[in-house]
Curated annotation (Swiss-Prot):
Record lineage: Eukaryota, Metazoa, Chordata, Craniata, Vertebrata
Single GO molecular function: hydrolase activity
The UniProt record lists the keyword Transmembrane helix: no
PANTHER family: QUEUOSINE 5'-PHOSPHATE N-GLYCOSYLASE_HYDROLASE, QUEUOSINE 5'-PHOSPHATE N-GLYCOSYLASE_HYDROLASE-RELATED
InterPro entries: Q_salvage
Chain's gene name: QNG1
Family: Belongs to the QNG1 protein family.
Known role: Catalyzes the hydrolysis of queuosine 5'-phosphate, releasing the nucleobase queuine (q). Is required for salvage of queuine from exogenous queuosine (Q) that is imported and then converted to queuosine 5'-phosphate intracellularly. In vitro, can also catalyze the release of the q base directly from Q as substrate; however, it was shown that Q is not the biologically relevant substrate. Shows a very low activity on queuosine 3',5'-diphosphate, and cannot release q from queuosine 3'-phosphate and from the 5'-nucleotides AMP, UMP, CMP or GMP, indicating specificity for the queuine base.
Modified residues (N-acetylmethionine): 1
Catalytic activity of the protein: queuosine 5'-phosphate + H2O = queuine + D-ribose 5-phosphate
Protein's recorded name: Queuosine 5'-phosphate N-glycosylase/hydrolase
Active site, UniProt feature: 239 (nucleophile or transition state stabilizer)
């Protein structure tokens, strides 16, 4: 992929040429200070992925890796037109919305004996079967069900042809390199090719490919096949929630023109200049927050419990956004429907 900037290079280039989205250095420091208080706790450790989320697999085995692959293959566009009227999945006495509604639906299907994490099943699954698997417990369906069906079929067929039907084989081919795994995923599976143009350059975000690498690292607890020596090279996952929380915390600022658009709920399109700026600046902002946090930890003379990387910051900030939804209502997220995030 000649002339294509990787996610970190892309975000730096976008932030340097942005017209409507800006990174606030004071806000970056404030977010780093907020995270400093969490540096010694479970929130910023790889183990937190399982400990803090009951829907994620408990095991660190092939079945768990294949669960991660299916959920991240479908990990896009969960926002609802109205917050009080949305897709909800009830599972084991609890209700889940957003991304967690997908995880609950996958677990519900497995409990019902539907082998949704098996490539030989989802390579040929029908649209009606997908509608049933992803059914909502409200009258609001999960968005983009037809696209999810198409992508499951396409991805399942490729996984069977190239990797013997198991994502663990793909992980093993990457030889403990996060970058190699990310590129293998992007090259093998078309729906993961999150690439666009900005100022005449080809830029990449690879949101789902990066989160797939991160979740594989997390489900395998950073051990064995999941011990990626270059895991810190993975950046945050540029979606529609992270920019909202970064703006809420004052690390990201929008121009009046863009803010007006977002407040009106105008839809952006994938590859629009402003959409690219929001994603690129968010990604670079988290890189700066990480650098600042590591400096603060060093100044305090503390040793973190493990490696602090952009993945763990993303996990924490995403959970923060989920837990502070009410506080963040005044800051709009950017509305877009696409398969990349």
């Amino acid at each position: 992929m000649d002339g294509l900037l990787n996610p970190r290079e892309s975000s730096k280039f976008i932030a340097e040429n942005s017209r409507d989205v800006f990174i606030d250095s004071g806000g970056v420091r404030r977010v780093a200070e907020l995270l400093l208080a969490k540096a010694a706790g479970p929130e910023l450790r790889v183990e937190g992925w399982k400990a803090l989320h009951e829907l994620n697999p408990r095991a660190a085995d092939e079945a768990a890796v294949n669960w991660v692959f299916v959920t991240d293959t479908l990990n896009f566009s969960f926002w609802s037109e109205q917050d009080e009227h949305k897709c909800v999945v009830r599972y084991r006495g609890k209700t889940y919305s957003g991304y967690w509604s997908l995880c609950a639906a996958v677990n519900r299907a497995l409990d019902e004996g539907i082998p949704i994490t098996s490539a030989s099943y989802y390579a040929t699954v029908t649209l009606d079967q997908v509608r049933n698997i992803l059914r909502s417990d409200t009258d609001v369906s999960m968005p983009l069900v037809e696209e999810r069906h198409r992508i499951l079929n396409e991805t399942g067929k490729i996984l069977l042809e190239k990797f013997g039907g198991s994502f663990l084989n793909c992980v093993r081919e990457s030889e403990n390199s996060a970058q190699k795994l990310m590129h293998l995923v992007v090259e093998s599976f078309p729906s993961y090719r999150d690439v666009t143009l900005f100022e005449g350059k080809r830029v990449s975000f690879y949101k789902r490919a990066q989160i797939l690498v991160a979740d594989t690292w997390s489900v395998l607890e950073g051990k064995g096949d999941g011990c990626f020596k270059d895991i810190s090279s993975i950046t945050m996952f540029a979606d529609y929630r992270l920019p909202q929380v970064l703006a809420h915390l004052g690390a990201l600022k929008y121009s009046d023109d863009l803010l007006k658009k977002l407040l009106k709920g105008e839809m952006l399109s994938y590859g629009d200049r402003q959409e690219v700026e929001i994603r690129g600046c968010s990604l670079w902002c988290v890189e700066l927050i990480r650098d600042c946090l590591l400096e603060l930890i060093e100044q305090k003379g503390e040793k973190p419990n493990g490696e602090i990387n952009s993945i763990l910051l993303d996990y924490y900030l995403w959970d923060y956004a989920h837990d502070h939804r009410e506080d963040m209502k005044g800051i709009p997220f950017h509305r877009i429907r696409c398969i990349y995030y």
